[in-house]
Amino acid sequence: MVFSSNVFLFLFLPIFLGLYYLSGQRYRNLLLLVASYIFYAWWRVDFLALFAGVTLWNYWIGLKVGAAGVRTKPAQRWLLLGVGVDLAILGYFKYANFGVDSLNAIMTSFGLEPFILTHVLLPIGISFYIFESISYIIDVYRGDTPATRNLIDFAAFVAIFPHLIAGPVLRFKDLVDQFNNRTHTLDKFSEGCTRFMQGFIKKVFIADTLAVVADHCFALQNPTTGDAWLGALAYTAQLYFDFSGYSDMAIGLGLMMGFRFMENFKQPYISQSITEFWRRWHISLSTWLRDYLYITLGGNRKGTFNTYRNLFLTMLLGGLWHGANFTYIIWGAWHGMWLAIERALGLDTNPQRFNPVKWAFTFLLVVVGWVIFRAENLHVAARMYGAMFSFGDWQLSELNRAQLTGLQVATLVIAYLTLAFFGLRDFYRNARPTPKATPVQVNADGSIGLDWTRVMTRALILLLFVASILKLSAQSYSPFLYFQF
């Protein structure tokens, strides 16, 4: 089940919210857990056993780590056992096929018989719920959060359906108080609805339209320079609007239930360095990698060379987290290399002024990286890079011109104008969120006033949301890109 589907919008969500607000406070976490398992089982019922098993395992390990004491040797042994089993589960389901295929390629080159392995199906969301479980037991070990004895709350944290499939990557220590006591207000619910609709519009109106352009350009066997750059730019925008759209919808759903999740994007394409980019892109993952991998490797505490090595390894493993493919490994290495270079050069990664040259160079590095991230294999990536940097024919090929529509071109232009407007607005506000406000305000004399700008903005969002639903009914199924990770 996906958020941008009729089943979710018109069946699952209304029934869940109705039951949620009709039930008492003490039963809401249990209802959330049951609903989240139903949501997950809509994909495959049989993987619920794995999901529940991982949850119970980390709940038990958390208790053992907590009982052993903060940062003690016994606690460390329990922690290593817990993390080891978690990574073994993730490694089997996510990397077994890749590992066997790579090994077989080597063996057959020497004339040896290949291994035979039944194809291992990747459970949806496993990368996210494994990482969240690992962060919990590490936080218990570090003393950042006590081990919970409330199995319902912990299981609901792991399973909570708004973020279950594609993040944000949540942490128990940030949400434990909200599970125990969260507020439900009309303002928060209204904010959640607006945020959900914004994400839905991003996904259906922009990302799904640009997906057709990107898919066609990457599929061309002999792309021109124009084809390759069009595909790269279309995918760059598609990925942002798709993934940030999902995050907006997840955050909005959380608000409807009284939760406030962390922000996952802060206008990343306005960045003037790769370091700044990773403070703005997929924030929940980048901070997870920093806190639980980079720091564990030693961070910047063990000399200059080790700092560069740790930056590189963190991003290399971050690339591998995205999938079992050499393309993701190279993408991670690409970003790790530039993070290390920027640290070595001592670049200003907190700019107070907008520098077009720094921005353009950073954006170019990001776009170049997205090409190999999107490519199915190294051959496709090489084909795209060869066309992009041959600087040959900037005209679109006949195949591309025949497929490209005016709506797709207009959507691409609108996407980048939107990115530029909100990115520059965010930069000149020093990345501070706008003060919370509501369309309806009570004046000093007790009269009711309306902020017509906000009223019209929300009316436009509602109109576009309805139009997006109509568009959704006319197009084929289009899952979120990060479902595959």
UniProtKB/Swiss-Prot annotation:
Pfam families attached to this UniProt entry: MBOAT
GO cellular component: plasma membrane
Enzyme class label: transferase
EC number: 2.3.1.-
Superkingdom field: Bacteria
Transmembrane stretches, start-end: 7-24, 39-61, 78-100, 115-137, 150-172, 312-334, 360-382, 402-424, 461-483
GO molecular function, one term: acyltransferase activity
Keywords: Acyltransferase, Alginate biosynthesis, Cell inner membrane, Cell membrane, Membrane, Transferase, Transmembrane, Transmembrane helix
Entry function: Together with AlgJ and AlgF, forms an inner membrane complex which probably interacts with the alginate polymerization-transport complex and adds acetyl groups at the O-2 and O-3 positions of mannuronate residues. Acetylation of alginate is important for the architecture of biofilms and increases the ability of alginate to act as a defense barrier.
UniProt family annotation: Belongs to the membrane-bound acyltransferase family.
Listed name of the protein: Probable alginate O-acetylase AlgI
